[in-house]
């Protein structure tokens, strides 16, 4: 059976949690393959219960699904334990959550360095969440990181943390004028935290591939979005990992030939958090409307999201770099009551029109959106369950976005609830 990748096709916050939740009851495994607690998924159950997840895969809310935090994720032990407790206190069974032995641990010195670096950068800061994600990935690439499996051996763990802090304390004390961290305290705190998750540590690569060979279906859940990818995003205003579909194989240990479908999540308009170029950003009453009606505040940071019209240049780019086979269009209901809905179909840069993503970031910063005005609709569409239930102008909007983005819009979200979804094509049934 297949492995299916679910990715954000914009700058994150597209509604990936809802998509995972919708598919979760029909898959056996849900895997988070990159990022850390710098991203959040909001899931609204049919009961009306609202869950905000930051590190744990959204499939934890579906009984019988095995959830995996993959080797590509960076794990803050304190956040993990707090999130587990929060779920368990609300009656959620977390017994089927596993953690890759090769995932990296995010430790106090990563958070400290992240925060002081942002302050030091001042107006040149990237706009990170301050959660330590970037510094943890830096250590991974520099080969001085701490892996989850290291907590199983006190001697190995102590040696690695002492070695890491030799450098980190130099940075904290001599560059940022902060107090040095005590390696012994870091080790003891981590070992105490590990008592709460050591039983979850597993060779998840082996388990996932064995499951696929047994005919089970695996859903690979990315965090953030395509335009935040460290390689393919709006660098340097990006995250420190690969949310794109290529990162799914690397961050889970599943070979790329196992992946049979890539589901891109697209919001019916566009948002982003933090600094960086955003050609369709709105600064008028329309931006205020999208922010207020769409509830555009970050799940993780609480920061207000920047809002703009749908950008088909971004959508086409996401289709290309991810190999997207299907789209899940979310928050179509937010656009109800607008007289017209502009869609960006290209950019104008220094007087010349281009229809694809600019090659350089300096060009993207200068890009002016070229809009196609589509007629809006006034009807409340939150109760629509079939495509034909939508007003004709809403259907036309979806079909035009599908044409511009270059892949089939298989699902449409018309509200936050799991049941507030129109399925035009069954993503799982359409695959081998």
Swiss-Prot record:
GO cellular component: cytoplasm
E.C. designation(s): 6.3.4.4
Keyword vocabulary terms for this entry: Cytoplasm, GTP-binding, Ligase, Magnesium, Metal-binding, Nucleotide-binding, Purine biosynthesis
Superkingdom of the source species: Bacteria
Residues annotated to bind GTP: 12-18, 40-42, 305, 331-333, 413-415
Pathway: Purine metabolism; AMP biosynthesis via de novo pathway; AMP from IMP: step 1/2
Cofactor: Mg(2+)
Catalytic activity, as annotated: IMP + L-aspartate + GTP = N(6)-(1,2-dicarboxyethyl)-AMP + GDP + phosphate + 2 H(+)
Regions that span the bilayer: none
Parts forming coiled coils: none
Gene3D superfamilies: Adenylosuccinate Synthetase, subunit A, domain 1, Adenylosuccinate Synthetase, subunit A, domain 2, Adenylosuccinate Synthetase, subunit A, domain 3
Sites where the protein binds Mg(2+): 13, 40
Record's cofactor remark: Binds 1 Mg(2+) ion per subunit.
Sequence positions that bind IMP: 13-16, 38-41, 129, 143, 224, 239, 303
Active site: 13 (proton acceptor), 41 (proton donor)
Any one GO BP annotation for this protein: 'de novo' AMP biosynthetic process
Record localization: Cytoplasm
The keyword Ligase is assigned to this record: yes
GO terms of molecular function: adenylosuccinate synthase activity; GTP binding; magnesium ion binding
Role noted for this protein: Plays an important role in the de novo pathway of purine nucleotide biosynthesis. Catalyzes the first committed step in the biosynthesis of AMP from IMP.
Assembly and oligomerization: Homodimer.
NCBIfam families, per the entry: PRK01117.1, purA
Protein family according to the UniProt entry: Belongs to the adenylosuccinate synthetase family.
Protein name: Adenylosuccinate synthetase
Gene source species: Mycobacterium avium (strain 104)
Classification of source organism: Bacteria, Bacillati, Actinomycetota, Actinomycetes, Mycobacteriales
Gene encoding the protein: purA
């Amino acid at each position: 059976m297949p492995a299916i990748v679910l990715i954000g096709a914009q700058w994150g916050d597209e509604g990936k949690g809802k998509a995972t939740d919708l598919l979760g009851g029909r898959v056996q495994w849900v895997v988070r393959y990159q990022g850390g607690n710098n991203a959040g998924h909001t899931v609204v159950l049919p009961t009306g219960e609202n869950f905000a997840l930051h590190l744990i895969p959204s499939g934890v809310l579906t009984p019988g699904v095995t959830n995996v935090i993959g080797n590509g994720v960076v794990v803050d032990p304190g956040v993990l334990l707090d999130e587990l407790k929060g779920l368990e206190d609300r009656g959620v069974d977390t017994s089927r959550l596993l953690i890759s032995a090769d995932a990296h641990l995010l430790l106090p010195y990563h958070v400290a360095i992240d925060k002081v670096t942002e302050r030091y950068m001042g107006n040149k800061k990237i706009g990170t969440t301050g959660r330590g994600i970037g510094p943890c990935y830096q250590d991974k690439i520099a080969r001085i990181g701490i892996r989850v499996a290291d907590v199983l051996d006190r001697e190995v763990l102590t040696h690695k943390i002492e070695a890491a802090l030799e450098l980190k304390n130099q940075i904290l004390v001599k560059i940022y004028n902060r107090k040095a961290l005590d390696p012994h305290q870091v080790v003891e705190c981590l070992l105490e935290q590990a008592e709460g998750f050591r039983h979850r540590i597993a060779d998840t690569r082996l388990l996932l591939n064995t499951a696929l060979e047994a005919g089970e279906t695996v859903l690979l859940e990315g965090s953030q979005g395509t335009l935040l990818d460290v390689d393919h995003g709006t660098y340097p205003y990006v995250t420190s990992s690969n949310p794109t579909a290529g990162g799914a194989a690397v961050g889970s240990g599943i070979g790329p030939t196992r992946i049979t479908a890539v589901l891109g999540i697209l919001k019916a308009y566009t948002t982003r958090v933090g600094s960086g170029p955003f050609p369709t950003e709105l600064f008028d009453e329309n931006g205020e409307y999208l922010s207020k009606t769409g509830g555009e505040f970050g799940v993780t940071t609480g920061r207000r999201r920047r809002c703009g019209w749908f950008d088909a240049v971004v959508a086409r780019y996401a289709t290309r770099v991810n190999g997207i086979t299907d789209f899940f269009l979310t928050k179509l209901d937010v656009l109800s009551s607008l007289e017209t809905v502009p869609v960006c179909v290209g950019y104008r840069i220094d007087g010349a029109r281009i229809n694809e993503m600019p090659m350089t970031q300096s060009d993207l910063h200068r890009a002016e959106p070229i809009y196609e005005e589509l007629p809006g609709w006034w009807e409340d569409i939150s109760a629509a369950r079939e495509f034909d239930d939508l007003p004709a102008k809403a259907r036309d909007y979806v079909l035009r976005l599908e044409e511009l983005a270059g892949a089939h819009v298989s699902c449409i979200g018309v509200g936050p609830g799991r049941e507030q979804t129109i399925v035009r094509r069954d993503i799982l049934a359409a695959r081998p």
